[in-house]
Amino acid sequence: MNNINNIITRFLKNQWKEWRISILFLAFFVIPMKSSLADWNWVPTGSMNPTIVEGDLVYVNKLAYDLRFPLTLHSLKHWSDPERGDISVLFSPEDDARLVKRVIGLPGDRIEMKNNVLFINGQRLEYSELSETNIKDLMSDLRHHSIFAEENLDGRKHAVMSTPSIPTNKRSFGNVTVPEGHYFVMGDNRDNSKDSRYFGFVERKLFIGKATNVIVSFNKLDKYQPRFGRFFTSLN
């Protein structure tokens, strides 16, 4: 038994000597950097279709709003807050799941929706026709059975979609006021997104950062074929 223990001990010592620099680099640089400065996020669902599609790897700027102590929600330096139209990465107030959603309502805003048309502070948002180039990466079934539009959110235009065949009671809701220190977020795929219509307002401290770019993208339904046209593209 002692021989076995000695062999294991020597093996572990040799492995430590060989890998210690890499392990220390990972522990003291890579992990803190991903936690506080910049990160990437694989998107597994279609809640942000057509802006973000399943299989996108998005870049997350964790310095967009503040600098945080690594691996915590504690803010070391605050310099801005989420703005209307931001695509933000945040923790769900419901179960701490990591989500990618669009900021719709700011503190004090009055939000209302009538048949998938948004009203903010009593003003109806402007909607216009969406170019087909914005939906070319969606599944064929969605392209042919969904309704698409370009939504103007305080001058920030972005794509939204709805699918009439999806049963939901969230296409309309009454006037709600966003509390101080909280935000109202939604997915661009309005009929297939679990967002503030389900889990309520999101506290400011739960925002992780801003998703700004697609790094790479792979089609999970087609043997993970790369979508080269989405590589290194900006998110609106």
Residue ranges and their predicted role:
Residues 2-15, 36, 41-42, 50-236:
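Soluble "head" domains of membrane/secretory-pathway proteins
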Residues 20-36:
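Hydrophobic membrane-insertion alpha-helices, especially the h-region
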